[in-house]
Swiss-Prot record:
One of its GO terms (biological process) is axon guidance. GO terms for molecular function: cell-cell adhesion mediator activity; signaling receptor activity. Specifically expressed in endothelial cells. Expressed in endothelial and intimal cells of the ascending aorta. Changing D622H: In AOVD3; uncertain significance. Glycans are attached at N246, N360, N389, N396, N680. Residues 32-131, 137-224 form the Ig-like C2-type domain. Pfam families: fn3, I-set, Ig_3. It comes from the Eukaryota. The keyword Transferase does not apply. Receptor for Slit proteins, at least for SLIT2, and seems to be involved in angiogenesis and vascular patterning. May mediate the inhibition of primary endothelial cell migration by Slit proteins. Involved in the maintenance of endothelial barrier organization and function. This is Roundabout homolog 4.
Length: 1007
C-alpha cells in the first residue's frame, strides 16, 4: 500500500518537471541573425575563392547562398560548394584573360547573398560582389624617343592599359626601377615629368603597369640629353634637305581590339651638312576638294631619325604627309608632300536615336547618324530592316544619301520592329537595336482609349491656337472685320447727310463771278428742282424764310438752304448750283401815290408780332443757318449810307456792283398794267388795297465765242407825270386760298415801290414782267429790296402772290412802252402768250426810243447764282405740282438747250409751237417770281449813276470792274453818255417783235 502510494507520487512529480524542462527549452529558442556578412572579393591566385557567412539562432539556422537573387544548386558540376560552417567555395574561378579575350572584359561575376533560416524566421545578409582581376595587354599611350636639352623640362608620356583593379604605373630606366627624386621627377596619370634635364638622365625608359592580374611593360623609349648650344649660325639647319620617300599603311594590331585605328610608317632621307637635326616632326592633314580651303596641318613628334610610326588617323580619308626637321627652337625647311588614301571600313557604331511614329497607314522611321569618329569612311546611305513575325514577313530598304528618315507603308495591324545600319564603301556597319511599334485597328484603339481622345483633341487645339501664323491670321481677320464695320457705319451716316444730286456752289461772290464765266457744261434746267406745296409752307409754324429753297422731305433743310442773306463769312459754305440765271422781282404798288421816300423817312412796314417769332430761318446752330436773316439794303437809303450800314468801307470786286436804275417806260408800263389788274382783283369779295407786280427776268445769255464784255441797253421809256393812285384799306383785303401746290420761293419782306405811277384807275395793280432786254439784268435768285426784316408779306399777300384763280387774268407787259387793252393771256411757265389783238400792237410798237430819264422803280442787281428752287420759278410754274398738266409742257421746254432758250423771243416762239400741238392749258399758278439779294450799293453809285442814266447789260468776267471804270471815266470826261445806243440790237428786237404766229396758233405775248 505504501509502496504503491510512493510510486504514484513519484509519477505525479515527474510530469511538472517535464513541463518545466520543455518550457525552459522553448524559452531558449531565438530567430536567426547574421553575425558575419560576406565581403566583396577579388580572385587573386589560382586557388578557389572563399566567401564567409555566419549566423546565430535557436535552433541553429540553415545557411543558403543566392547568386543575383537566385539560389545556388550546389550540385556538381556546379563550381560552388557549401562548407558546414556556411562558407561558400568557388572551385573553378575564371582564368585571367588578355585584352582580346572577351571573358576577361567581364570582371563582375555577380552579387552573392547569404540567407539563414529556422522555424522562427529568416535573415538575409548584405550582398557581396565577386570580381576577377583583369589587365589588358596594350598600352593606351606608348612612350616615345625624344631629345632634351640640359636644364630644360621634358615629359615622357605613358597611358597604362585598362584593367581591374586600376593598375599602378612605375618607370624603369635601363632595366631598373627609376628612383624618383622629389622636385625633379613627377608621375601624373602614368606620364613622367622631369623639371630639369641633366646629362645623367640619358637612357632607355620603360613604363610598367601592375595590378592583381599581373603587370604589363611598354616599349622602350630613348631619351637623349644635349648640352645647350649657341644658335648664332642657323645656316647649317636651313641647309638640311629632307626627302620623304615612303608612307605605308600598317596592318591593324589584333591586340588593340576589334576596332583598331589606322597607323602609317613614314620613311625619309636626310642630306646636307654633317650635323643632323635634333628631332623630326610629322605634319599631316586631310585632303580637301579642289578649290576648297585646306585644313590646318596637325603636328606629331616622330620617335625616329629616318623612319617612324604615325597614328591618330581615320579610315576612308585622304591624307597629305610631310616631315620637318628641328633643333631646339630652330626649324628647318619642310620635306616634300606625299598623298595616301586610307581604305574605308564599315562604320564602327550604329545609328543613334532610332524612333518609330505611326501615320495614316504608314510608319515613319527616323534616326541620327553615328558619331563622326566611327564613320570609318564616307557614309553613302543606310540600310533599314523590318524584322518579320507571325503575321508580317521580313523586309529591308536602302536609303541613299544623307536622308535620315523613311516612310514604310503598313497594310495590316501588328507589331513592326526595325533596325538601321550605316553603309560606307566597305559595306553596312553594325545595326542598331531593334525598335518596335504596335499598330492596332482603329476600332480597337477607339474602344480601348475612349477617354484619351477628348484631352488629346483639346491639347491639339491649344497647340494650334498658340502658333504664330494662327495668331497673325486671327488678328488680320479681326482688323478687317473692324474696318468693314467702320466703313458700313460711315456709309450709313453719310447716306443720311449726303448732299442731293446736282451741282453745288460756294457762296463767295468771287467764286460766283468766276463760275459764271464758264457755262459750257451747265444745263438750262437743273435736275434737282423740288416741288413744295404752297399750302404746306403757309401752314407750317416755321418762318417763311426758312422754307425758301428747302425740300420738306429733306431732313437737313437748314444745311441745304439756298440763300445767304447776311454778309459773307470767311468760311465759304457749299450750296447747290444750277448755273442758270433767271430771277424775278416782286414790287408792292400802293393804292395812293406816295412821296418819294427819303433816307430820313423810310417807307417800310413793321413786322407783325405774330411773324416776329418766325424771322429766324432755322434754330440750328449751323453757321450757315444762323446767317440767313434778310440783309438786302433798303432803296430809301443813299448808296453811301447803305454802304456804311453794310460796313463796306472800301470797294471790293466780290461785294460791289453798280446800282441799275429802271427807265420811265418800264415804270409807266408797270403802273398801267397794275391799274388793269386791279379790276380783276376787285371782283373778289373784299376790296384789294394793294396789288403785287411781278417782274420776271431771264438770265444773261453767255456768248461762248467771246470773252469780251458785251453790253446791252435797256429799252427807252418816255417820262410820265407823277400822280397819286387811290389807296385802299389793308383790312378789307380778302385772303386768297391756294389752288395748287407750288415750289415758288417767297421773300421774307415786301418790296416798297419807290416811283409814282399814273393816275388812279380801276385797274389798280397787276402782275407784270419786263422786256427781254431788261430781264437780262437780274439772275434767278430770291431777294428782298428791304434791308431789315420788318418789311414782310402778310399771309394773305403771300397766298395772293402764290396762286391766282383760274378765272383771273395775268396780263404781261410788252416791249412797247405804250399801254394796250387788257386781254387774258395764256402762260406756259415763264412764257406769256398774248391774244391775237396784241400782236398788232407789238408790230406798231416794236421800235424803241432813246431814254429821256427816269426814276428808280425796282432796280435789279447783279445777284448770286440761282438755286434749284429759284430755277424752278424762272423756268416754269407748270413744274410746281405733279398733277398739273402744264408741268409736262414745261418739261418739254426745259429739256431743250439753254444756250438759245435764254433768249426770250425764241422761248415765246417755242411756246406758240408747243401750244399748236395741243398742249395748251389754262394757267393755274400765280406768276410771281423774285430776284436774288444783291450786294449792298457801292459809294461810287452816286458818282456816275443818275436818275436819267440807263445802264446797259453786260456779261460777267474777272476784269469787269476795271473795264467798267475805264469806260465810264473816258465817256464822262468827253461829256458823252456812258453807254451808246445799240442800233443793231434794237433793230433785231424790232424784227423779232414783228413776227406773226400762224393761223390757228394761240396768240403769243412777245413782251
Amino acid at each position: 500500500m505504501g509502496s504503491g502510494g510512493d510510486s504514484l507520487l513519484g509519477g505525479r512529480g515527474s510530469l511538472p518537471l517535464l513541463l518545466l524542462l520543455i518550457m525552459g527549452g522553448m524559452a531558449q529558442d531565438s530567430p536567426p541573425q547574421i553575425l558575419v556578412h560576406p565581403q566583396d572579393q577579388l580572385f587573386q591566385g589560382p586557388g578557389p575563392a572563399r566567401m564567409s557567412c555566419q549566423a546565430s539562432g535557436q535552433p541553429p539556422p540553415t545557411i543558403r547562398w543566392l547568386l543575383n537573387g537566385q539560389p545556388l544548386s550546389m550540385v556538381p558540376p556546379d563550381p560552388h560548394h557549401l562548407l558546414p560552417d556556411g562558407t561558400l567555395l568557388l572551385l573553378q574561378p575564371p582564368a585571367r584573360g588578355h585584352a582580346h579575350d572577351g571573358q576577361a572584359l567581364s570582371t563582375d561575376l555577380g552579387v552573392y547573398t547569404c540567407e539563414a533560416s529556422n522555424r522562427l524566421g529568416t535573415a538575409v545578409s548584405r550582398g557581396a560582389r565577386l570580381s576577377v582581376a583583369v589587365l589588358r595587354e596594350d598600352f593606351q599611350i606608348q612612350p616615345r624617343d625624344m631629345v632634351a636639352v640640359v636644364g630644360e623640362q621634358f615629359t615622357l608620356e605613358c597611358g597604362p592599359p585598362w584593367g581591374h583593379p586600376e593598375p599602378t604605373v612605375s618607370w624603369w630606366k635601363d632595366g631598373k626601377p627609376l628612383a624618383l627624386q622629389p622636385g625633379r621627377h613627377t608621375v601624373s596619370g602614368g606620364s613622367l615629368l622631369m623639371a630639369r634635364a641633366e646629362k645623367s638622365d640619358e637612357g632607355t625608359y620603360m613604363c610598367v603597369a601592375t595590378n592583381s592580374a599581373g603587370h604589363r611593360e611598354s616599349r622602350a623609349a630613348r631619351v637623349s640629353i644635349q648640352e645647350p648650344q649657341d644658335y648664332t649660325e642657323p645656316v647649317e639647319l636651313l641647309a638640311v634637305r629632307i626627302q620623304l620617300e615612303n608612307v605605308t599603311l600598317l596592318n591593324p594590331d589584333p591586340a588593340e581590339g576589334p576596332k583598331p585605328r589606322p597607323a602609317v610608317w613614314l620613311s625619309w632621307k636626310v642630306s646636307g651638312p654633317a650635323a643632323p637635326a635634333q628631332s623630326y616632326t610629322a605634319l599631316f592633314r586631310t585632303q580637301t576638294a579642289p578649290g576648297g580651303q585646306g585644313a590646318p596641318w596637325a603636328e606629331e613628334l616622330l620617335a625616329g631619325w629616318q623612319s617612324a610610326e604615325l597614328g591618330g588617323l581615320h579610315w576612308g580619308q585622304d591624307y597629305e604627309f610631310k616631315v620637318r626637321p628641328s633643333s631646339g627652337r630652330a626649324r628647318g625647311p619642310d620635306s616634300n608632300v606625299l598623298l595616301l588614301r586610307l581604305p574605308e571600313k564599315v562604320p564602327s557604331a550604329p545609328p543613334q536615336e532610332v524612333t518609330l511614329k505611326p501615320g495614316n497607314g504608314t510608319v515613319f522611321v527616323s534616326w541620327v547618324p553615328p558619331p563622326a569618329e566611327n564613320h570609318n569612311g564616307i557614309i553613302r546611305g543606310y540600310q533599314v530592316w523590318s524584322l518579320g513575325n507571325t503575321s508580317l514577313p521580313p523586309a529591308n530598304w536602302t536609303v541613299v544619301g544623307e536622308q535620315t528618315q523613311l516612310e514604310i507603308a503598313t497594310h495590316m495591324p501588328g507589331s513592326y520592329c526595325v533596325q538601321v545600319a550605316a553603309v560606307t564603301g566597305a559595306g553596312a556597319g553594325e545595326p542598331s537595336r531593334p525598335v518596335c511599334l504596335l499598330l492596332e485597328q482603329a476600332m480597337e484603339r477607339a474602344t480601348q482609349e475612349p477617354s484619351e481622345h477628348g484631352p488629346w483633341t483639346l491639347e491639339q487645339l491649344r497647340a494650334t491656337l498658340k502658333r504664330p501664323e494662327v495668331i497673325a491670321t486671327c488678328g488680320v481677320a479681326l482688323w478687317l472685320l473692324l474696318l468693314g464695320t467702320a466703313v458700313c457705319i460711315h456709309r450709313r451716316r453719310r447716306a443720311r447727310v449726303h448732299l442731293g444730286p446736282g451741282l453745288y456752289r460756294y457762296t463767295s461772290e468771287d467764286a460766283i463771278l468766276k463760275h459764271r464765266m464758264d457755262h459750257s457744261d451747265s444745263q438750262w434746267l437743273a435736275d434737282t428742282w423740288r416741288s413744295t406745296s404752297g399750302s404746306r409752307d403757309l401752314s407750317s409754324s416755321s418762318s417763311l424764310s426758312s422754307r425758301l429753297g428747302a425740300d420738306a422731305r429733306d431732313p437737313l433743310d437748314c444745311r441745304r438752304s439756298l440763300l445767304s442773306w447776311d454778309s459773307r463769312s470767311p468760311g465759304v459754305p457749299l450750296l447747290p448750283d444750277t448755273s442758270t440765271f433767271y430771277g424775278s422781282l416782286i414790287a408792292e404798288l400802293p393804292s395812293s401815290t406816295p412821296a418819294r421816300p427819303s433816307p430820313q423817312v423810310p417807307a417800310v412796314r413793321r413786322l407783325p408780332p405774330q411773324l416776329a417769332q418766325l424771322s429766324s430761318p432755322c434754330s440750328s446752330s449751323d453757321s450757315l443757318c444762323s446767317r440767313r436773316g434778310l440783309s438786302s439794303p433798303r432803296l430809301s437809303l443813299a448808296p453811301a449810307e447803305a454802304w456804311k450800314a453794310k460796313k463796306k468801307q472800301e470797294l471790293q470786286h466780290a461785294n460791289s456792283s453798280p446800282l441799275l436804275r429802271g427807265s420811265h417806260s418800264l415804270e409807266l408800263r408797270a403802273c398801267e398794267l397794275g391799274n388793269r389788274g386791279s379790276k380783276n382783283l376787285s371782283q373778289s369779295p373784299g376790296a384789294v388795297p394793294q396789288a403785287l407786280v411781278a417782274w420776271r427776268a431771264l438770265g444773261p445769255k453767255l456768248l461762248s465765242s467771246s470773252n469780251e464784255l458785251v453790253t446791252r441797253h435797256l429799252p427807252p421809256a418816255p417820262l410820265f407825270p407823277h400822280e397819286t393812285p387811290p389807296t385802299q384799306s389793308q383790312q378789307t383785303q380778302p385772303p386768297v386760298a391756294p389752288q395748287a401746290p407750288s415750289s415758288i420761293l417767297l421773300p421774307a419782306a415786301p418790296i416798297p415801290i419807290l416811283s409814282p405811277c399814273s393816275p388812279p384807275s380801276p385797274q389798280a395793280s397787276s402782275l407784270s414782267g419786263p422786256s427781254p432786254a431788261s430781264s437780262r439784268l437780274s439772275s434767278s435768285s430770291l431777294s428782298s429790296l428791304g434791308e431789315d426784316q420788318d418789311s414782310v408779306l402778310t399771309p394773305e399777300e403771300v397766298a395772293l402772290c402764290l396762286e391766282l384763280s383760274e378765272g383771273e387774268e395775268t396780263p404781261r407787259n410788252s416791249v412797247s412802252p405804250m399801254p394796250r387793252a387788257p386781254s387774258p393771256p395764256t402762260t406756259y411757265g415763264y412764257i406769256s402768250v398774248p391774244t391775237a389783238s396784241e400782236f398788232t400792237d407789238m408790230g406798231r410798237t416794236g421800235g424803241g426810243v432813246g431814254p429821256k430819264g427816269g426814276v428808280l422803280l425796282c432796280p435789279p442787281r447783279p445777284c448770286l447764282t440761282p438755286t434749284p428752287s429759284e430755277g424752278s420759278l424762272a423756268n416754269g410754274w407748270g413744274s410746281a405740282s405733279e398733277d398739273n398738266a402744264a408741268s409736262a409742257r414745261a418739261s418739254l421746254v426745259s429739256s431743250s438747250d439753254g444756250s438759245f432758250l435764254a433768249d426770250a423771243h425764241f422761248a415765246r416762239a417755242l411756246a406758240v409751237a408747243v401750244d399748236s400741238f395741243g398742249f395748251g392749258l389754262e394757267p393755274r399758278e400765280a406768276d410771281c417770281v423774285f430776284i436774288d439779294a444783291s450786294s449792298p450799293p457801292s459809294p461810287r453809285d452816286e458818282i456816275f449813276l443818275t436818275p436819267n442814266l440807263s445802264l446797259p447789260l453786260w456779261e460777267w468776267r474777272p476784269d469787269w470792274l476795271e473795264d467798267m471804270e475805264v469806260s465810264h471815266t473816258q465817256r464822262l470826261g468827253r461829256g458823252m453818255p456812258p453807254w451808246p445806243p445799240d442800233s443793231q440790237i434794237s433793230s433785231q428786237r424790232s424784227q423779232l417783235h414783228c413776227r406773226m404766229p400762224k393761223a390757228g396758233a394761240s396768240p403769243v405775248d412777245y413782251s
